[in-house]
């Protein structure tokens, strides 16, 4: 079983740690300020996400079909919702500082350009 872990390092790079290749993180993208992932749970035998929860709400030992929005089973995950913010490497591109509320709820006032990308992806092997 291979595990692929994506995370943002302290150096603002998005990394991939792939256990099937090596235990050395591979940098993928520079200047990533934030990455958020939530899991879409299909409740009561439905095939679409009824709610989205963070990994902290997932319970490894929970039986399939018993998920709630406060405690989910990994086997009930049918989609993921992701959101990440990237910024320019030059922090002086804009003529004046712009107030920007990032994904983590922090106000940023430097002169860098930023873009937030978000989306939902269905896990096809989970939907009938």
State where each predicted segment sits.
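Short linear sequence signals and composition-biased patches located at protein termini or domain-edge surfaces
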Residues: 1-2, 7-128
């Amino acid at each position: 079983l291979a595990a692929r872990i994506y995370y943002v390092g302290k150096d603002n790079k998005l990394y991939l740690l792939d256990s099937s290749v090596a235990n050395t993180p591979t940098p993928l993208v520079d200047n990533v300020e934030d990455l958020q992932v939530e899991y879409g749970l299909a409740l009561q035998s439905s095939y679409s996400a009824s709610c989205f929860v963070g990994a902290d709400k997932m319970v490894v030992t929970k039986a399939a079909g018993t998920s709630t929005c406060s405690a989910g089973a990994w086997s009930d995950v049918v989609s993921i919702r992701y959101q990440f913010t990237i910024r320019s490497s030059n922090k002086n591109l804009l003529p004046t500082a712009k107030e920007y509320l990032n994904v983590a709820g922090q106000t940023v006032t430097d002169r860098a350009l930023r873009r937030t990308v978000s989306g939902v992806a269905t896990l096809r092997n989970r939907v009938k």
